[in-house]
């Protein structure tokens, strides 16, 4: 027999409430945009960005926030809109404001104050500071325009705001054909994995420039990294991001610093020698004013180290093994052909390929407490994007599956690692669900295995886009363009 469930809401009431929330979310969009463009204020909801988002995306961010609430209550636009409106009237200076956390703090510490008074007091540090920001925009040059280079371009263009942060000024490539500029623009505009570019792109072949969402980008053709005078394009004190992977040590990357207009260099691959390998959220505070060249480590190192740090801080790691199930990359072959690496010459779309990974060793460079405790290996699989790290760990302190999952959920919600660690608890998610994830890694709670002191954790990661977001965070720190974050 069919079970009859009681009806608690009428259809018209349900739709009416949706339309009401939809209208409020729609009213939030111009306020979010004005604060971003005019005040350099970045808004989010528990780490989910609101800039350039649709009405539905804003409503989904509110719905997602229930995972961040102690009582699993859904965050309402009726709660966030008044805070956003109050912010828009305060002539704020540059800031990063989490509306979800502002609501939670108002509920806990409002003490009978009006929302306007609470917001003014909470943001007092930047109230009335519009146009008073002493920061200058930092010019950025992308040396290379492959998978990571194009995703970095998308993120930088998206984050342009009022122009006081990172500004993409040029890309450097080797000329591949007569219609090279058109083809480069097409690859930025369309992507088989990440979808279409969110905006407009125009091409000026006479001057070798692309204009993407108002960003004038000079395309420079060169085969020699040390031979370019960037100042002739109006570029000065620039941060250059080498995403070719061709040079990985200070000597090779130092060629860029010989060029007029370049001040600092970031490598999007594991660095060799004495180069600092930086994973944002873990050791980004190690970046010093005198550091001219740093590495943003690898996608896998970025994915595993935040989770490893969280686990080690709470339970202590005795030892362990890291196995990565990694999507194929353009270093592999479509069909069997010669490759200098073992097994990697075999067809990537047709095979699972066992190969090596330096992530375990690199993790110890970023987090020295793990030195000598981890081994690692990798399996390349026939998917174009999104990988998984399996962390098989022996702990000093025994735990349970429920306890460690809840701990990692809290780390994803309320810790300093919330931009690096995400958390999902669903028996239905698969790899493509994580395309476009902006986190370094996503813990899959349903897959966690625990037996006293032994735990196996599974972390998904978008090895392209998630890693690129981490690179941009490192760039922002190196350039000193990170605004203060609220609530405190």
What are the functions of these language-model segments?
Residues 455-461, 470-488:
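Generic C-terminus detector
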Residues 302, 398-399, 465-466:
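A generic structural signal for alpha-helix starts
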Residues 2-333, 341, 473-474, 481-485:
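N-terminal Rossmann-like NAD(P) cofactor-binding subdomain of oxidoreductases
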Residues 173, 393-397, 459-461:
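Short beta-strand-to-loop capping motifs
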Residues 291-295, 454-459:
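Short pre-catalytic strand/loop immediately N-terminal to key active-site residues, enriched for Gly-Thr
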Residues 2-61, 314-316, 320-443, 447-453:
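C-terminal substrate-binding/catalytic lobe of Rossmann-fold NAD(P)-dependent dehydrogenases
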Residues 380-384, 460-467:
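Glycine-rich phosphate/pyrophosphate-binding beta-alpha loops
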């Amino acid at each position: 027999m069919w079970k009859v469930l009681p009806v608690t809401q009428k259809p018209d009431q349900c739709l009416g409430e949706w339309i009401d929330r939809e209208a409020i979310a729609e009213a939030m969009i111009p306020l979010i945009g004005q604060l971003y463009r005019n005040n350099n204020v970045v808004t989010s909801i528990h780490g989910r960005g609101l800039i350039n988002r649709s009405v539905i995306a804003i409503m989904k961010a509110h719905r997602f926030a229930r995972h961040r609430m102690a009582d699993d209550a859904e965050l309402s636009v009726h709660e966030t809109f008044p805070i956003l409106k109050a912010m828009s009237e305060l002539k704020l200076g540059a800031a990063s404001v989490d509306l979800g956390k502002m609501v939670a703090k108002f509920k806990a510490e409002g003490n009978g104050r009006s929302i306007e008074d609470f917001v003014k007091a909470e943001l007092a540090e930047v109230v009335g500071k519009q146009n008073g920001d002493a920061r200058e925009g930092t010019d950025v040059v992308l040396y290379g325009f492959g998978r990571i280079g194009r995703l970095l371009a998308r993120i930088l263009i998206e984050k342009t705001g009022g122009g006081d942060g990172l500004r993409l000024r040029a890309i450097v490539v080797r000329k591949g054909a007569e219609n090279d500029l058109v083809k480069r623009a097409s690859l930025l505009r369309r992507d088989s994995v990440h979808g279409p570019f969110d905006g407009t792109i125009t091409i000026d072949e006479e001057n070798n420039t692309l204009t993407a969402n108002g960003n004038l980008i000079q395309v420079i053709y060169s085969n020699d990294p040390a031979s370019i005078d960037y100042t002739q394009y109006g570029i000065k004190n620039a941060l250059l991001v080498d995403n070719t992977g061709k040079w990985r040590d200070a000597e090779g990357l130092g060629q860029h610093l010989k060029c007029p207009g370049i001040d600092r260099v970031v490598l999007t691959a594991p660095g060799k020698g004495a180069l600092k390998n930086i994973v944002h959220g873990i050791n980004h505070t190690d970046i010093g004013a005198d550091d001219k060249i740093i590495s943003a480590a690898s996608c896998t190192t970025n994915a595993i180290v935040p989770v490893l740090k969280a686990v080690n801080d709470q339970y202590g790691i005795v030892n362990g093994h890291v196995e990565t199930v990694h999507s194929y990359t353009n270093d592999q072959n479509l069909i069997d052909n010669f490759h200098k690496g073992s097994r990697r010459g075999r067809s990537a779309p047709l095979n699972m390929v066992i190969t090596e990974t330096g992530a375990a060793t690199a993790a110890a460079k970023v987090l020295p407490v793990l030195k000598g405790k981890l081994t690692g290996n990798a399996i390349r699989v026939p998917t174009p994007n999104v990988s998984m790290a399996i962390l098989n760990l022996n702990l000093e302190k025994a735990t349970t599956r429920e306890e460690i999952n809840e701990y990692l959920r809290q780390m994803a919600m309320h810790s300093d690692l919330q931009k690096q660690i995400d958390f999902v608890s669903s028996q239905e998610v698969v790899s493509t669900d994580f395309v476009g994830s902006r986190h370094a890694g996503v813990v899959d709670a349903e897959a966690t295995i625990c037996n006293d002191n032994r735990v196996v954790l599974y972390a998904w990661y978008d090895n392209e886009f998630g890693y690129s977001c981490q690179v941009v965070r490192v760039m922002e720190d190196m350039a000193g363009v990170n605004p203060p974050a609220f609530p405190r």
